[in-house]
């Protein structure tokens, strides 16, 4: 028989069992729903409620909302949800108005791929998955305000996702004001002449297409032809953040190639400095802040112009402008748009054969090399390959400080995604440039004095000398000399010279690239954009939102051979001609016109960029969010100067994806005056992972963990020895344990306790089903201390508890309260267990005052049993909004403490004393102790060191 179905239970009909837990939990979940127990009142609007509750200090607690996958939840998924629920319950009991709810992030590739696999429409499968997950989550007893729940696929929700896109599209970043402004204000500047157009023509003289192109250079959301990450195996393009370090798609592990396609982008780079600087005011783990700082990648240097006779100039960004005199060639990324403008019709006379790649003309060489480079990922291109590849463009540029002509190459180790996509090559002092120069027999010049004994002739070197701790040499022209200067001073001098001569200036560069925002998928938010017959993009008016997804016969993305870098994407929406081609009156005075809809969709990150705002005012169909409601829950306040959610819990894997994107959207909305909070999440907490053992047979295939037997330290499945490693939990690994199984066997409260007791919340830990019973027994003992298992009657008495019990109780109250506030739930459970064990050991019926406070202590952790016991103790109201117990300091302090007395560093006595004893009193007691007197043996005392109440150290004469 199992632990939950023993003969003993038959003899004790009112014992706390799995069956009783199921009954209790179902009843109280129904009660909470019926009573709206977890409904948090807004200060105004349709969700306003109890003014007394709304007047309390507020707490907005959020989880990263789940994808509704077809597999449902395993026990690892609810770890964070249970933790935030425990924390939220404690905050309610300590006088806060707590907003805690949960929605679903239901658009995007995961849901679409599941739908494709099962042959059902994404909406049908996604909604079915959500219903299943709602049942699973409700079973856990999570205290969510369900009035505020939604899914990102709800048209009422993505109407506002589209609306936000239009705000971003219709905005530009004013670098002088350091904020976003409406694009109409920029147009006004062009119209009145306070801002000149690039070619000096008046705004009215520009064609509609020219105006659109010019504004596109400023808009915070814009479409452009640019190199993107194209995954033929997925049939879509990917953001940089969705590509793994080895150049493959994060989802599906397909090869990713560079392809030049027209795509929508978000100008997140305009906010790079603010995204970086505002991290300092956030209460986030330092590891996450570091990841964002590195991803944004701020570096100081200079922009330098290298003139090209036939095409203006090539601009480079360098952090080592001090080495300009050593630049002997240049390299452009193969995709650089300057390449076409500089290549001559024929190779210049005397071109080195190794530079041409064996091609008859520069154009042929460039075309062939570009095709070769396109088949590589960025990671492959930047790998330290033994053989450096590239080709001469046939063009020369002029080094602006030396006046020398330097050849211009293209090579795949230079990327368009950093700096300007062009570099000045200083081979004597850069490892990659050194290797390239050796491969192509290019000249090198030493301009930094080596600190070793290699000399100053790079032709004799085995590698580059790249130290910063050295002086400049060979770095002078008729106007400036850097010789003898250190790197820092040389940088400052040459930067000043470049600016004076109009060939460069000091600048800051960022690793961060603009956010690729379009996907060739069906299951995403449609763009509220249409194109006229001239190809000019027009925003839909707000009255036409939401633009809903149309029905299509085939919603699968068209995928290709994963290795086919030449394949071109095809969007599912483009197959619905009736939806794509429309006649609309956009209200711009042009009347009804024919338009073509944008057929890309938004990425799965779009809906999660602003969902915290929708939780605040979920039924508002007039505006994004009521300003007074947003100010109440998320506005700036003392200690939170940029506002935001009070606590946001989720995985660390979203450091440079969701978290960065959401910060960007918040800043745009803040700049435009729509919200008061400049940051979405003030405090971030990353929970650890619940791991599980994975068992694999000799072929490396996972076998069901539940069917594995252990014999003499080895593991067997169906008689075959298998290996065991600790890893993730999941359906594909055949080691998933569902919360449904544990709830059926022990109850939801036991599952909650076990997950919180496994270890510190931010540390990963292995799941062990066999250990769950420990928390089940805790609840059984706690129940038994309040309820008679034979009769079901409450056994408490109205008497005062003894001194020992009061001390145990108040120490537990003090410790549990601190642990709850600090999210140290494992140690809180340990303290509750210690108190319950004390009460069990003491025997006899509990004092009512002790029993009630014991129930209140366990209530945030195990709310169902707490509600049941609270009701049985005679209370008609819910335990949820009761005050959390407050410890009496008099009982928290120990009655006596042990003081160690040392003589010459050796312990000679231990004294039981009051913790309030003074140094003088303690010294007198120690010197009078018989053991101390005997140990001194009549010797005099040179010194007594007292550290009351724990230590006395005696130094004999």
Curated annotation (Swiss-Prot):
Pfam families on file: Anticodon_1, tRNA-synt_1_2, tRNA-synt_1g
Keywords: Aminoacyl-tRNA synthetase, ATP-binding, Cytoplasm, Ligase, Nucleotide-binding, Protein biosynthesis
Alphabetical list of PROSITE patterns matching this protein: AA_TRNA_LIGASE_I
Enzyme class: ligase
Motif ('KMSKS' region): 728-732
The EC number(s) this enzyme carries: 6.1.1.4
Record CDD domains: Anticodon_Ia_Leu_BEm
HAMAP family with a match to the protein in the record: Leu_tRNA_synth_B
Family affiliation: Belongs to the class-I aminoacyl-tRNA synthetase family.
Protein name: Leucine--tRNA ligase
């Amino acid at each position: 028989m199992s632990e939950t179905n023993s003969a003993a239970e038959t003899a004790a009909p009112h014992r706390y069992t799995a069956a009783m837990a199921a009954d209790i939990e179902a009843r109280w979940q129904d009660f909470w729903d019926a009573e709206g127990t977890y409904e948090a009142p807004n200060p105004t609007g349709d969700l306003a409620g109890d003014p007394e509750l709304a007047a309390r200090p507020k707490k907005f607690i959020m989880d990263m909302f789940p994808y509704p996958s077809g597999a449902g939840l395993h026990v690892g998924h609810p770890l964070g949800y249970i933790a935030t629920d425990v924390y939220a319950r404690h905050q309610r009991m300590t006088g806060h108005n707590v907003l805690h709810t949960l929605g679903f992030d239901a658009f995007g590739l995961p849901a679409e791929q599941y739908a494709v696999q099962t042959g059902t429409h994404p909406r049908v499968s996604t909604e079915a998955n959500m219903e299943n997950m709602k049942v699973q989550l409700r079973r856990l007893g999570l205290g969510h305000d369900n009035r505020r729940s939604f899914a990102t696929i709800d048209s009422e929700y993505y109407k506002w996702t589209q609306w936000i896109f239009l705000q971003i599209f219709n905005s530009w970043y004013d670098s002088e004001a350091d904020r976003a402004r409406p694009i109409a204000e920029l147009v006004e500047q062009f119209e009145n002449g306070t801002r000149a157009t690039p070619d000096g023509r008046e705004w009215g003289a520009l064609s509609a297409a020219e105006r659109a192109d010019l504004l596109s250079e400023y808009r915070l959301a814009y479409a452009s032809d640019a190199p993107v990450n194209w995954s033929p195996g997925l049939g879509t393009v990917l953001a940089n953040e969705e590509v793994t370090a080895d150049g493959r798609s994060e989802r599906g592990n397909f090869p990713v190639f560079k392809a030049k396609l027209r795509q929508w982008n978000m100008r997140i780079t305009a906010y790079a400095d603010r995204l970086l600087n505002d991290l300092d005011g956030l209460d986030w783990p330092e590891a996450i802040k570091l990841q964002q700082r590195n991803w944004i990648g701020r570096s100081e240097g200079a922009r330098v112009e290298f003139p090209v006779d036939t095409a203006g100039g090539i601009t480079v960004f360098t952090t080592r402008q001090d080495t300009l005199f050593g630049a002997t060639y240049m390299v452009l990324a193969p995709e650089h748009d300057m390449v076409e403008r500089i290549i001559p019709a024929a190779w210049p006379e005397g071109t080195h054969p190794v530079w041409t790649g064996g091609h008859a003309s520069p154009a042929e060489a460039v075309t062939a090399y570009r095709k070769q480079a396109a088949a590589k990922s960025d990671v492959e291109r930047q790998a330290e390959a033994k053989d450096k590849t590239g080709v001469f463009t046939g063009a020369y540029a002029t080094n602006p400080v030396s006046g020398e002509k330097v050849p211009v190459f293209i090579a795949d180790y230079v990327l368009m995604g950093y700096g300007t996509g062009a570099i000045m090559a200083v081979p004597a002092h850069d490892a990659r440039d050194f290797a390239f120069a050796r491969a192509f027999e290019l000249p090198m010049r030493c301009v930094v004095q080596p600190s070793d004994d290699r000399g100053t002739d790079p032709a004799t070197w085995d590698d580059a000398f790249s130290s910063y701790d050295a002086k400049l040499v060979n770095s002078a022209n008729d106007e400036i000399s850097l010789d003898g200067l250190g790197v820092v001073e040389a940088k400052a001098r040459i930067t000043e010279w470049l600016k004076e001569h109009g060939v460069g200036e000091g600048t800051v560069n960022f690793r961060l690239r603009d956010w690729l925002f379009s996907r060739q998928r069906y299951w995403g938010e449609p763009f509220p954009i249409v194109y006229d017959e001239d190809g000019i993009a027009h925003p839909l008016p707000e009255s036409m939102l939401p633009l809903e997804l149309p029905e299509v016969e085939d919603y699968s993305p068209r995928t290709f051979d994963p290795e086919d870098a030449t394949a071109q994407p095809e969007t599912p929406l483009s197959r619905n001609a009736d939806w794509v081609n429309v006649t609309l009156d956009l209200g711009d005075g042009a009347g009804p016109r024919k338009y073509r809809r944008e057929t890309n969709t938004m990425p799965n990150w779009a809906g999660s960029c602003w969902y915290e705002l929708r939780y605040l005012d979920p039924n508002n169909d007039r505006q994004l969010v009521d300003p007074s409601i947003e100010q109440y829950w998320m506005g700036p306040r003392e200690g939170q100067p940029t506002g935001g959610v009070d606590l946001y819990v989720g995985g660390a894997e979203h450091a440079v994806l969701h978290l960065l994107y959401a910060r960007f959207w918040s800043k745009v909305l803040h700049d435009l005056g729509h919200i008061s909070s400049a940051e979405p999440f003030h405090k971030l907490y990353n929970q650890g992972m619940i791991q599980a053992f994975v068992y694999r047979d000799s072929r490396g295939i996972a076998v069901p963990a539940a069917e594995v037997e252990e014999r003499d330290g080895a593991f067997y499945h169906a008689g075959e020895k298998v290996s065991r490693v600790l890893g993730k939990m999941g359906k594909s690994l055949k080691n998933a344990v569902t919360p449904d199984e544990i709830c059926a066997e022990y109850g939801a409260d036991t599952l909650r306790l076990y997950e919180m007791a496994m270890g510190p919340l931010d540390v990963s830990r292995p799941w062990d089903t066999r250990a769950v019973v420990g928390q089940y027994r805790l609840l059984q003992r706690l129940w038994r201390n309040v309820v008679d298992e034979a009769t079901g009657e409450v056994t408490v008495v109205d008497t005062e508890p003894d001194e020992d019990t009061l001390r145990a109780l108040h120490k537990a109250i003090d410790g549990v309260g601190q642990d709850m506030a600090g999210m140290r739930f494992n140690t809180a459970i340990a303290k509750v267990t210690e108190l319950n064990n004390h009460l069990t050991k003491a025997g006899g019926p509990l004092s009512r005052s002790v029993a009630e406070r014991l129930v209140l202590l366990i209530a945030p952790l195990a709310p169902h049993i707490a509600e049941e016991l609270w009701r049985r103790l005679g209370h008609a109201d819910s335990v949820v909004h009761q005050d959390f117990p407050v410890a009496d300091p008099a009982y928290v302090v120990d009655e006596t403490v042990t003081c160690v007395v040392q003589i010459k560093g050796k312990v000679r006595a231990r004294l039981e004393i009051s913790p309030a004893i003074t140094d003088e009193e303690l010294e007198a007691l120690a010197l009078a102790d018989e053991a101390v007197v005997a140990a001194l043996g009549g010797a005099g005392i040179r010194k007594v060191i007292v550290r009351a109440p724990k230590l006395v150290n005696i130094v004999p004469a």
